[in-house]
Swiss-Prot record:
GO function terms (MF aspect): ATP binding; ATP hydrolysis activity; ATP-dependent protein folding chaperone; unfolded protein binding
Any GO BP annotation: iron-sulfur cluster assembly
Pfam families: HSP70
Stated role: Chaperone involved in the maturation of iron-sulfur cluster-containing proteins. Has a low intrinsic ATPase activity which is markedly stimulated by HscB.
Name of the featured protein: Chaperone protein HscA homolog
Family, similarity comment: Belongs to the heat shock protein 70 family.
InterPro entries: ATPase_NBD, Heat_shock_70_CS, HSP70_C_sf, HSP70_peptide-bd_sf, Hsp_70_fam, ISC_FeS_clus_asmbl_HscA
PROSITE patterns attached to this UniProt entry: HSP70_1 (PS00297), HSP70_2 (PS00329), HSP70_3 (PS01036)
NCBIfam families hit by this protein: HscA, PRK05183.1
Length: 621
């Protein structure tokens, strides 16, 4: 008699078998894939033992692609078809990309995103990133000889919704199931915190090839709570390379270079920058296509001087993050350094001076993010015991809200709110009989919608006609653990509902994010004055509309003199509303108009009561 094997529904026939999930650090310069083996995270090497995969893709005329080190060899000889630093283009349009004029590519600006023209056709940054992710997936599958159930992919903390969505789309193209998008500093904190059993407040300073992030976290018994985050999604090692390149051009008095010579010299500058991390002197020595020899020496001190403003920008962001967390630099127990660009001595020294402590360098800055992602992937795959689990509490970088009457912003979720989160607020209609409501979702720190970034618009239609202010419309914001936003609006009485998943065409630029926060502080007083004026203007318009409605229905209650007096007061109020910029003056005019219409309001009330009581006796009242 055959024995039947019985298992729980949904369970593997081998319950001891681990589900393989990987952590992927999709970097600007290099990418890595890691898994957890024997309870320890490990970066997977390729067949040659190399753990870093250069984030470079080359397109060939025959439809083939080269990736990693193979493609890197063609950066100089085939610059138009060899795509580097594609992460800087993710979720962005042409106007969003810095130093676009120095890039060697032929860009195609299409609605929704830019594309790069290659011999294999126009390629989007999503498609290029998908090629990199596909190579990492193949590397992982070859290493474990098993199916990969999913991946945790890391992104800069300051990636906006468009950039995060682009990353998920690239993973989908590469055949990878995304278990979660994890902020890079948070991934690094997981690695450091679990590796060192650390508790207390820590900063994660993440300076990669194309992005910068700073996160302030509190680590405590398996809980990783992000207190504040800041960053610049277009500042990284590439910018240091570009600054050195411009300096060499100036020193050598070179004319504008061809695409080929530009790539040649830029690669030489990158190599010199890396040498200066370990040597006091370096030399940029290259021969250009026309035979011109470029031979320029540079010292560490000179390099520090020409790149100091880039380092200072990162420090300013660190100070802002500390303020947002309500902390001082001395409250930070340690600073975890992440990203290859943190190897630069001037960066190490500047961070040490700001926080008053030597940065923590006991973990490889190139690997720490991928290792943390692997541990989170292993947890999400269900391989960790209850005792090994931990909790991540990440935050959103900028406030979210909607535009209300008068162009004001009502913030529903303040910046640095832990995610996932859902918040609801009730709003109402402005005019009598209003049956639709246009809702604009905005992101930023200013008081007026025009000064914030618009994320999307949608309309709620089918609101039952009723008096202004009678409808109750509940607007709900939801931000998931990956940082994706959805907004819904429901009219409470009828149940009419509308919603939107926010998918902006282009992402926020670093300048916009920095400006939003700085303007929020620098313009606080001005914003409050503007908000006060808008509020009084809304009150004035509401009164004008209400009086006009009353006159249309009950003008017969007034004699000619009373009508003329109210008309004069309304004309004066309308003139002040159109011309006045002082909220106190508008408020005074509204108060006067209210007084001028008090008798009319009383007459309408009396008439209404008289009408209601007409034909009834005392016993019916």
């Amino acid at each position: 008699m055959a024995l039947l094997q019985i298992s729980e529904p949904g369970k593997s026939l081998a319950p001891h078998q681990r589900r393989i999930a990987v952590g992927i650090d999709l970097g600007t310069t290099n990418s890595l894939v890691a898994i957890v083996r024997d309870a320890l995270p490990k970066v997977l090497p390729d067949a040659q033992g190399r753990e870093l995969l250069p984030s470079v893709i080359r397109y060939l005329p025959n439809g083939r692609t080269q990736a990693g080190f193979e493609a890197l060899e063609s950066v100089v000889i085939d610059p138009k078809n060899t795509i580097v630093s594609v992460k800087r283009f993710m979720g962005r349009g042409l106007l969003d990309v810095e130093h676009i004029e120095s890039a060697p590519y032929d860009f195609v600006d299409q609605p929704g995103m830019l594309k790069l023209r290659t011999v294999a056709g126009d390629k989007s940054p999503i498609e290029v990133s998908a090629e990199i992710l596909a190579r990492l997936r193949q590397l992982a599958e070859d290493s474990v000889s098993d199916e990969i159930v999913g991946a945790v992919i890391t992104v800069p903390a300051y990636f906006d919704d468009a950039q995060r969505q682009a990353t998920k789309d690239a993973a989908k193209l590469a055949g990878i199931e995304v278990l979660r998008l994890l902020n890079e500093p948070t991934a690094a904190a997981i690695t450091y915190g679990l590796d060192n059993a650390s508790e207390g407040v820590y900063a994660v300073y993440d300076l990669g090839g194309g992005t910068f992030d700073i996160s302030i976290l509190r680590m405590s018994r398996g809980v990783f709570e992000v207190l504040a985050t800041g960053g610049d999604s277009a500042l990284g090692g590439d910018d240091f390379d570009h600054r050195l390149y411009c300096w060499v051009i100036e020193q050598a008095k070179l004319p504008p270079l061809s695409i080929h010579d530009h790539r040649t010299l830029l690669q030489a500058c990158k190599h010199a920058k890396e040498q200066l991390s370990h040597n006091p002197l370096a030399r940029v020595h290259e021969t250009l296509a026309d035979g011109t020899v470029v031979n320029v020496g540079i010292s560490q001190a000179q390099f520090f001087e020409i790149t100091q403003n880039l380092v200072t920008k990162t420090l300013m962001t660190c100070k802002k993050a500390l303020r947002d967390a309500g902390l001082k630099a001395e409250d930070v127990k340690g600073v975890v350094m992440v990203g290859g660009s943190t190897r630069m001595p001037n960066v190490q020294r500047a961070v040490a001076e700001l926080f008053g402590t030597q940065p923590l360098n006991n973990l490889n800055p190139d690997q720490v993010v991928a290792l943390g992602a692997a541990m989170q992937a292993d947890l999400l795959a269900g391989n960790q015991s209850k005792d090994d689990e931990w909790l991540l509490l990440d935050v959103i970088p900028l406030s979210l809200g909607i535009e209300t009457m008068g162009g004001l912003v009502e913030k529903s979720i303040p910046r640095n709110t832990p995610i996932p989160v859902a918040r609801a607020q009730d709003f109402t209609t402005f005019k009598d009989g209003q049956t639709a409501l246009a809702i604009q979702v905005v992101q930023g720190e200013r008081e007026l919608a025009q000064d914030c970034r618009s994320l999307g618009r949608f309309e709620l239609r089918g609101i039952p006609a009723m008096a202004a202010g009678a409808a109750r419309i509940r607007v709900t914001f939801q931000v998931d653990a990956d940082g994706f936003l959805s907004v819904s609006a429901t009219e409470q009485g009828s149940g009419v509902k509308a919603s939107i998943d926010i998918k902006p065409s282009y992402g926020l630029t670093d300048a916009e994010i920095t400006r939003m926060l700085q303007d929020g502080f620098a313009s606080a007083k001005e914003d409050l004055l503007s908000r006060s004026l808008r509020e009084e203007q809304v009150n004035a318009q509401r009164l004008l509309d209400a009086v006009q409605t009353a006159l249309d229905s009950d003008r017969s209650l007034l004699n000619a003199e009373e009508q003329a007096a109210i008309d004069r007061e309304m004309t004066t109020l309308q003139k002040i509303l159109n011309e006045e910029t002082n909220s106190a003056v508008v408020r005074k005019a509204v108060d006067q108009a209210v007084k001028a219409t008090d008798d009319f309001a009383q007459k309408r009330m009396n008439a209404s009561i008289q009408k209601a009581l007409s034909g009834k006796n005392v016993t019916e009242i």
